[in-house]
Amino acid sequence: MPAIMTMLADHAARQLLDFSQKLDINLLDNVVNCLYHGEGAQQRMAQEVLTHLKEHPDAWTRVDTILEFSQNMNTKYYGLQILENVIKTRWKILPRNQCEGIKKYVVGLIIKTSSDPTCVEKEKVYIGKLNMILVQILKQEWPKHWPTFISDIVGASRTSESLCQNNMVILKLLSEEVFDFSSGQITQVKAKHLKDSMCNEFSQIFQLCQFVMENSQNAPLVHATLETLLRFLNWIPLGYIFETKLISTLIYKFLNVPMFRNVSLKCLTEIAGVSVSQYEEQFETLFTLTMMQLKQMLPLNTNIRLAYSNGKDDEQNFIQNLSLFLCTFLKEHGQLLEKRLNLREALMEALHYMLLVSEVEETEIFKICLEYWNHLAAELYRESPFSTSASPLLSGSQHFDIPPRRQLYLTVLSKVRLLMVSRMAKPEEVLVVENDQGEVVREFMKDTDSINLYKNMRETLVYLTHLDYVDTEIIMTKKLQNQVNGTEWSWKNLNTLCWAIGSISGAMHEEDEKRFLVTVIKDLLGLCEQKRGKDNKAIIASNIMYIVGQYPRFLRAHWKFLKTVVNKLFEFMHETHDGVQDMACDTFIKIAQKCRRHFVQVQVGEVMPFIDEILNNINTIICDLQPQQVHTFYEAVGYMIGAQTDQTVQEHLIEKYMLLPNQVWDSIIQQATKNVDILKDPETVKQLGSILKTNVRACKAVGHPFVIQLGRIYLDMLNVYKCLSENISAAIQANGEMVTKQPLIRSMRTVKRETLKLISGWVSRSNDPQMVAENFVPPLLDAVLIDYQRNVPAAREPEVLSTMAIIVNKLGGHITAEIPQIFDAVFECTLNMINKDFEEYPEHRTNFFLLLQAVNSHCFPAFLAIPPAQFKLVLDSIIWAFKHTMRNVADTGLQILFTLLQNVAQEEAAAQSFYQTYFCDILQHIFSVVTDTSHTAGLTMHASILAYMFNLVEEGKISTPLNPGSPVSNQMFIQDYVANLLKSAFPHLQDAQVKLFVTGLFSLNQDIPAFKEHLRDFLVQIKEFAGEDTSDLFLEERETALRQAQEEKHKLQMSVPGILNPHEIPEEMCD
């Protein structure tokens, strides 16, 4: 069978592509089937045939046959793809009679298929695709070649309800294409013309919608009309909304009909979102009428949370749409309702609904409600941030300090507080969670959705606390009592309460915060003693740790408490339940960062600073921790030591602090001095890696003073580096590159990497560049550069490049003299690893360009000093970078190029020869990425670079002729150069299009956003053949706009003395 199929495919390939014979529709159906249901070689063959056929310039002439005679739906879809392709790219070069023919054919087909209601249901997808084809034709034809389209479609709609229903879909699609998705699909000018045409002819469409809504008994048609209307509401002239019966029709006629209520409510939401001041009365009517209908459909005493969980999809959607309506209306027009006493009751009912909907257990709906509560609380707080004297709720309603708007929302806000406390999302810091099976485990994946929800809830609760902190405290204290007495005890309830308590840190006055926190922590510690079972203890422990980590201000002010908390964390470091140790270390590091000074001072009632106690017992504290937890612990203690300002004391602390790792290090180094083979022992190498990781984390926290420890191990460490490098090279020579995957070799590479990390980490935090350059850099270069150059590519450490980049960034001019040596060792050999493709060695790739960027930014003179051949390589590598498909590399490449151009411009001597050699080349390469669709993400940067380059030409900064031997000015030459470049790349463009594009590159080079849109317009144009008729590109109109931009720019320049060259100033201004 496969053999026959392959023969068939081969034969088919020839036959289907032979346009001199009639199309064999059965054969085409077979090939399409083969594409969807075949496999391997035959599927590939089918793919190839169909692609060739689709790309054939005459393929569209076969579409009618395909649509009429094919029995296979997929073949029909394929036929429509061919048609869509020709409409989008070659329409302008088809003879007019053929365009008319295609148009008539498509319209006829749509009318035929959509006039029959049973057909409409059965062939929904097919009609959908046909509609899209018609809209693509409209974007080319209307209004110029089809001025009567709107009246045609409106007229046809009155002949048949089924046809009318489909026409509504076409109008909806057209609206979306023109108003919602036009950016990057059609040029700005054309989009504007289409929008104007739609607005101008909207009255006919609106009458049709009204006619259907008032007269039709056909439910699917009415639904389609409402859906279409929904798409129109965000752009139609406002008179159609507010000066017709539209609002009352939507509310009275459709809102309470189950089939239409969702789309009607969406329409009302869209209208509610309009912000204009002149239609206040209409907004009031919209609100009161909607609320009246709502109360009938969903009485105020409904338990919406329950109704939602038992509801069908349609009912659940209604509740979601209700939340959107209320949120939109209250945000936009809430203050209007507050001002009218007769609307107060309706406002309170709306808020009541919002509270009920906020209890629904569906995150998406809660997020919508939260957006409103956040808006309201923030607005009330910002109106008078400092009027939170006592508790408004407790002091009775007649409290004169309270701003009147707050008074109005008092009781509602108290309910929102309770809601926030009961539903608080999980913060990022909490690692101990209950999983879906009800087990308490460590969380490994961060849930970004939940983190964002937490941030929004936290912000809202902080505002609510500012508005009335006593009420917040009462709610929280009562809920905590119910945890302790067991009436509300559950992991979930305890979690949400503690997360809420942690989230309002800083929102209370310090005295209130102190009183409140002492109660909270005491109760939680009591709960920890009272509850049995490891899971219970783990949950309570995680909550205690989260809360104490959130209140550094309180801890700083209460030493006894801080000490108790830290000792409790040390206790938790021995608790082996999943996640507890991790969280203890994480909380410890947060507290160490925020309270660092308090650990190095002698506190009242203490005989020594607490740091000494920690260092004396360090062995006991960390004995149950895993290696990575030990590293975190070391970093935390490092922050404390970094806070000691007395250098002698600090040095003594660092020695004591690094005692354990140094003992192990010294013994390994001693053994290695006697017998170097110890450095091939897996356990020893692993130990070295762990010790260095400890040093890396310690150095990160201590900063520059760590030099005393680094100096102690520096030369031994570099010797170990060299020795391990030799071991790795020997292993590769003996056993090939595969050996780099072996555990021992990987451990050796870890030691090398951590060595580089330690050095670069310290350099980036050091504060004496000269000392670093003289004492630390020479032995480092000696150990790593030659080793890097000599190694096989697979064994080169990418960290060598990043370390060099960090050193250059930090030391700047102090290292310029070493750049040639660094470049000799790493530049060419790395370039050869990454210039074969865009994928291999991703880390080397990224770091290589970071190094280039560092040299370019901080040691630019070194670039000018390297030989021309090497400089050309540098430039080639930058061009290679911005052509990358890896986004970070491409971005770095563009960044380097932009900085390079700006640096060159500062160097008068070198600049002109640079321009002469490279300017046109760079332009050409930038245009090649601008017009490559896989690089659209870099468009802003492309625009900035091109604008800068065209500006250099225009302002005469390039004095050397870019085209030696030609008498024309550089500006004229570049205009021709770019025009010819684009004409040869896109021969289908008309001269007028290219000329206008090039003009814009000069006119808009001071206005980056406009320049970027100009590029985007050009990208739209290169996708299609324009033919002779370029009228729908509106070139004259665009030309006028560009001329105005040029004049504006000139005016601006004239207003700043000295910006314009004296020879560019008009005569009358010279006197």
From Swiss-Prot:
Region described as Necessary for interaction with RANBP3: spans on this chain: 411-481
- Region called Necessary for interaction with Ran and nuclear export complex formation, residue ranges: 327-450
Name positions with the PTM Phosphothreonine.
448
Domain Importin N-terminal, residue spans: 46-112
Residue runs in coiled coils: none
Q: Pull one GO CC term from this UniProt entry.
A: nucleus
Which residues are annotated with the PTM N6-acetyllysine? 446, 693
HEAT repeat positions in this chain?
A: 217-240, 241-277, 354-472, 515-553, 560-597, 602-639, 775-813, 885-916, 917-954, 1002-1039
Compartment list: Cytoplasm; Nucleus, Nucleoplasm; Nucleus, Cajal body; Nucleus, Nucleolus
Keywords from UniProt, A to Z, are: Acetylation, Cytoplasm, mRNA transport, Nucleus, Phosphoprotein, Protein transport, Repeat, RNA-binding, Transport
Which domain of life does the protein's organism represent?
Eukaryota
A GO molecular function annotation here is: nuclear export signal receptor activity
Q: Give GO terms for biological process.
A: cellular response to salt; cellular response to triglyceride; mRNA export from nucleus; negative regulation of transcription by RNA polymerase II; nucleocytoplasmic transport; protein export from nucleus; protein localization to nucleus; regulation of centrosome duplication
List residues modified as Phosphoserine: 391, 450, 966, 1031
Q: Where would you say this protein principally sits, based on its record?
A: cytoplasm
Record bears the keyword Nucleus: yes
Q: Which InterPro entries match?
A: ARM-like, ARM-type_fold, CRM1_repeat, Exp1_repeat_2, Exportin-1/Importin-b-like, Importin-beta_N, XPO1/5, XPO1_C_dom
Record bears the keyword Protein transport: yes
The Phosphotyrosine modification is found at: 454
Q: What does this protein do?
A: Mediates the nuclear export of cellular proteins (cargos) bearing a leucine-rich nuclear export signal (NES) and of RNAs. In the nucleus, in association with RANBP3, binds cooperatively to the NES on its target protein and to the GTPase Ran in its active GTP-bound form. Docking of this complex to the nuclear pore complex (NPC) is mediated through binding to nucleoporins. Upon transit of a nuclear export complex into the cytoplasm, disassembling of the complex and hydrolysis of Ran-GTP to Ran-GDP (induced by RANBP1 and RANGAP1, respectively) cause release of the cargo from the export receptor.
Report the family membership: Belongs to the exportin family.
Assembly and binders? Found in a U snRNA export complex with PHAX/RNUXA, NCBP1/CBP80, NCBP2/CBP20, RAN, XPO1 and m7G-capped RNA. Component of a nuclear export receptor complex composed of KPNB1, RAN, SNUPN and XPO1. Found in a trimeric export complex with SNUPN, RAN and XPO1. Found in a nuclear export complex with RANBP3 and RAN. Found in a 60S ribosomal subunit export complex with NMD3, RAN, XPO1. Interacts with DDX3X, NMD3, NUP42, NUP88, NUP214, RANBP3 and TERT. Interacts with NEMF (via its N-terminus). Interacts with the monomeric form of BIRC5/survivin deacetylated at 'Lys-129'.
What's the protein name?
A: Exportin-1
State the species of origin.
Rattus norvegicus
